[in-house]
Amino acid sequence: MTEYLLSAGICMAIVSILLIGMAISNVSKGQYAKRFFYFATSCLVLTLVVVSSLSSSANASQTDNGVNRSGSEDPTVYSATSTKKLHKEPATLIKAIDGDTVKLMYKGQPMTFRLLLVDTPETKHPKKGVEKYGPEASAFTKKMVENAKKIEVEFDKGQRTDKYGRGLAYIYADGKMVNEALVRQGLAKVAYVYKPNNTHEQLLRKSEAQAKKEKLNIWSEDNADSGQ
């Protein structure tokens, strides 16, 4: 619709210019010719104002919701709203399995969840056995989720389950992200980062850098060189 109005405005401008030309050629013929000249000039000015307004409106509509009508995304708008696309969903705790795994009741069904973007030392691995700081990580997660009045899960933009059928999500205990809390305490590393399931990657890396700086738990001097 805007395109048609713009075309009509351009036609009006052309007609106004022609009218001004006619008025100029007849301006010496009397008072009526002068009035005609002023009228034509006013029409041209008004037309130009309308065309300018319509042009601005058309440009604004091209980037509605961060997506151009041509199909390409506006990166500025997209980056500002990308995290808002994630949303938290309610769940209830069944049990904490280990540092990075919990079992929840989700949408009326029991489901095991693997915390996204983090890896804690093992406690129940068939080959690795119990690793250093594994029990501490398990106890930390257990305390967070068992003491919470509200548990929520937040899926990212990619796949929601792994090959074992476990849900891949960020887990929140009373609004605090368990994934990030583990990393901040030096009880988990940032790991298994696969786009687009990495919305909170930078948050976790910032917490990991701080835990390293403070040499917390797996980043302590005794374990820093061992890859723990």
UniProtKB/Swiss-Prot annotation:
Return the CDD domains for the record.
Answer: SNc
Q: Give the organism the record lists.
A: Staphylococcus aureus (strain COL)
A Gene Ontology molecular function term for this protein is: metal ion binding
Tell me the keywords, alphabetical order: Calcium, Endonuclease, Hydrolase, Metal-binding, Nuclease, Secreted, Signal, Zymogen
Q: An example Gene Ontology cellular component term from the record? A: extracellular region
So where's the catalytic machinery, residue-wise? 114, 122, 166
Stated name of the protein = Thermonuclease
Q: Which gene encodes it?
A: nuc
Task: Kindly report, in one word, the top-level EC class recorded for this enzyme.
Answer: hydrolase
EC number assigned by the record: 3.1.31.1
What this protein catalyses is: Endonucleolytic cleavage to nucleoside 3'-phosphates and 3'-phosphooligonucleotide end-products
- State if Secreted is listed as a keyword: yes
From the UniProt annotation, give the residues forming the signal peptide.
1-23
Location in the cell reads: Secreted
Give the cofactors, semicolon-separated. Answer: Ca(2+)
* Its job: Enzyme that catalyzes the hydrolysis of both DNA and RNA at the 5' position of the phosphodiester bond.
The UniProt transmembrane annotation reads none
Q: State the residue spans of region: Disordered.
A: 58-83
Output the superkingdom of the source species. Answer: Bacteria
List each coiled-coil range: none
Asked if the keyword Magnesium belongs to this entry, the reply reads: no
